[in-house]
């Protein structure tokens, strides 16, 4: 890994920790857990960035990163997993894709139908939907696998 990739990774992780910390405060996370929410947000977003850099598509990278966020942190700190995971996953939500899809909807209603606008809208809407679905599945899988009270069979 080059120096520029490491710098970009560090920058991405710091900038992802800030909204994770902010949303953790909005969700009234205990003060002792705030640093872990920021750390998880940074780890999740940084790992997703590395996976995308090395050729994985954003949907699958979001799934793997959200699974990584959901594993084992609550057992170490004796807290419910959602205390850490929800605030840490929020920086990975697809704001640009959702915004572009909504702008395309507004332009279609204002300017009328065009194939380019419709293609942009559908592409960005599906991309945002699949990323949100991957994040929600990735958050729920560790809870189903690791924190299950009854046996699976």
UniProtKB/Swiss-Prot annotation:
GO process annotations (BP): succinate transport
Q: Which UniProt keywords apply?
A: Cell inner membrane, Cell membrane, Membrane, Transmembrane, Transmembrane helix, Transport
The residues forming the signal peptide are none
- Bilayer-crossing regions: 7-27, 51-71, 83-103, 125-145
Asked if the Swiss-Prot or TrEMBL record annotates the protein with the keyword Ribosomal protein, the reply is no
The record ties this protein, via Pfam families, to: ThrE_2
Membrane topology term = Multi-pass membrane protein
The record's InterPro entries line, in alphabetical order, gives: ThrE_2, ThrE_Dicarb/AminoAcid_Exp, YjjB
List locations, semicolon-separated: Cell inner membrane
Query: Major location, coarse class?
Result: membrane
Q: NCBIfam families annotated for this entry?
A: PRK09917.1 (NF007391)
Query: Its family?
Result: Belongs to the ThrE exporter (TC 2.A.79) family.
Binding partners and assembly: The transporter is composed of YjjB and YjjP.
Q: What does this protein do?
A: Involved in succinate export with YjjP. Both proteins are required for export.
**HAMAP family, A to Z:** YjjB (MF_01191)
What protein name does the entry list? Probable succinate transporter subunit YjjB
Q: Which organism is it from?
A: Yersinia pestis
Q: Which gene encodes it?
A: yjjB
């Amino acid at each position: 890994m080059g120096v520029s990739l490491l710098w970009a990774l560090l920058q991405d992780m710091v900038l992802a920790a800030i909204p994770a910390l902010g949303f953790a405060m909005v969700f009234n996370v205990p003060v002792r857990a705030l640093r872990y929410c920021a750390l998880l947000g940074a780890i999740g977003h940084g790992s997703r960035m590395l996976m995308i850099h090395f050729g994985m598509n954003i949907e699958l990278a979001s799934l793997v990163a959200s699974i990584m966020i959901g594993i084992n942190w609550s057992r170490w700190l004796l807290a419910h997993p959602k205390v850490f995971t929800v605030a840490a996953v929020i920086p990975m939500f697809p704001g640009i894709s959702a915004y572009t899809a909504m702008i395309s909807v507004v332009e279609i209603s204002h300017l009328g139908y065009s194939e380019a606008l419709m293609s942009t809208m559908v592409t960005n809407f599906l991309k945002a939907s699949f990323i949100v679905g991957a994040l929600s599945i990735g958050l729920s899988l560790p809870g189903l696998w690791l924190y299950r009270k009854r046996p699976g069979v």
